[in-house]
Design a protein with these regions (language model features):
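Serine endopeptidase catalytic core focused on the charge-relay Asp
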Residues: 1-184
Length: 184
């Protein structure tokens, strides 16, 4: 199955989610929960091929468990991709030095409804058609502007790989137009 062969395909700037500096993601319970809100998205594109992206389960209000999934517009350009969606939860390495495929990941089937998207800002909001499995976390969010010099981190499945962790510091806001970038 090609989707399992994706393991190891991401770049070296993406750290295994089980690794990191001494204050890495699994040293802090809140950050561990945020990582548990991130899933590998696998879906069919209109041409018939299979694509992979990342999505994060988000909460809309305290106490609400409506399964809203935040992802990228370039993944969900039509409702068809959302309709065919499967989410791979807990697709994490078993240890820091292990590139092995985990045996306990859960594939959630049932698809989703595409609720909204923005090509300009490259976001998509979906609602899963079935409830996520036990142990998946609903991540909080904030629409406030992040100032310069603030530490940020991201959990994702680059190139369909096991869950990775990237972190850095903001240095102001940058606007990128990928449609006009070299190589397009």
């Amino acid at each position: 199955l090609k989707l399992l062969q994706d393991v190891g395909d991401s770049g070296s700037c993406n750290l295994n989610v089980m690794c990191g500096p001494p204050n890495g993601p699994f040293q802090d319970p809140q950050t561990r929960n945020q990582a548990a809100a991130t899933g590998k998205l696998v879906f069919t594109v209109p041409s018939g091929g299979t694509a992979r992206c990342t999505g994060t389960l988000i909460v809309d209000a305290p106490g609400s468990f409506t399964p809203y999934l935040y992802g990228a517009n370039h993944c969900f350009e039509t409702a068809y991709e959302a309709f065919t969606l499967n989410v791979w939860w807990f697709f994490d390495a078993t240890a820091c030095s292990s590139p092995a495929t985990p045996g306990d990941y859960v594939v959630q089937t049932g698809g989703a409804a595409l609720l909204g998207r923005s090509q300009d800002w490259d976001w998509a909001l979906l609602r899963l058609n079935t409830a996520p499995p036990e142990g998946v976390w609903f991540s909080g969010w904030d629409a406030a502007t992040v100032g310069s010099g603030v530490g940020v981190e991201s959990f994702h499945h680059p190139s369909g790989d096991l869950k990775k962790w990237s972190y850095g510091t903001t240095y102001g806001n940058v606007s990128v137009n990928f449609a006009s970038a070299a190589g397009g």
